[in-house]
């Protein structure tokens, strides 16, 4: 009787552990694909400024861009907090008109969870921001760049656009800077 009860307990414990492992594997290793961008670029296409994301420059001030690179947020909450604290400090010190993040924003298997947190932090500044992807943003194919792009497109202040599908990568876009409604810089 004791052996049977111990055997049942062991089966329940092992089944529970196996179930937890399966859920974790599904959450971490099932790729989130996202919607593929379908716009196609052609050299014959007419360029239209009004199709670009636009940031208005204050006439009385220089236009300031804060450039952030290689934040590489990952599974260490202490490091992530230090990174966010540093970003907050830089934003407060520089009061930028635009924040650009130039790749390696999130890293590793937890990127699907960290992306939302990162977007929330960036949106909290209420400043337009323009991210691009680096090699670490999709090094582990659990969150494709298309899926990450879908999340960025939901952001209130993010200027990200997926761009044409026939150009390499996801996130080929330009930002138009205007003053009094007139373009002063368009890359």
Task: Please name every model-derived segment.
Residues 2-21:
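N-terminal Sec-pathway targeting helices
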Residues 19-30:
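Hydrophobic alpha-helical membrane-insertion segments, chiefly the h-region
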Residues 29-117:
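N-terminal active-site segment of His-dependent metallophosphoesterases
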Residues 37-38, 43-50, 116-187:
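Extended active-site neighborhood of metal-dependent phosphoesterases/phosphodiesterases
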């Amino acid at each position: 009787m004791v052996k049977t009860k111990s055997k049942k307990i062991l089966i329940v414990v092992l089944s529970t552990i196996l179930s937890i492992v399966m859920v974790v594997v599904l959450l971490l290793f099932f790729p989130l694909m996202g919607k593929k961008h379908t716009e196609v670029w052609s050299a014959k296409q007419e360029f239209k400024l009004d199709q670009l994301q636009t940031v208005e420059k204050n006439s009385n001030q220089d236009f300031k861009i804060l450039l952030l690179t290689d934040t590489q947020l990952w599974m260490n909450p202490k490091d992530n907090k230090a990174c966010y604290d540093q970003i907050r400090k830089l934003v407060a010190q520089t009061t930028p008109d635009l924040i650009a993040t130039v790749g390696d924003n999130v890293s590793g298997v937890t990127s699907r969870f960290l992306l939302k947190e990162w977007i929330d932090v960036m949106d909290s500044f209420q400043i337009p921001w323009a991210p691009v992807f680096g090699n670490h943003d999709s090094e582990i194919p659990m969150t494709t760049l298309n899926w990450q792009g879908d999340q960025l497109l939901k952001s209130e202040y993010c200027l990200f656009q997926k761009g044409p599908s026939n150009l390499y990568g996801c996130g080929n876009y330009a930002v138009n800077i205007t003053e009094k409604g007139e373009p002063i810089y368009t890359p």
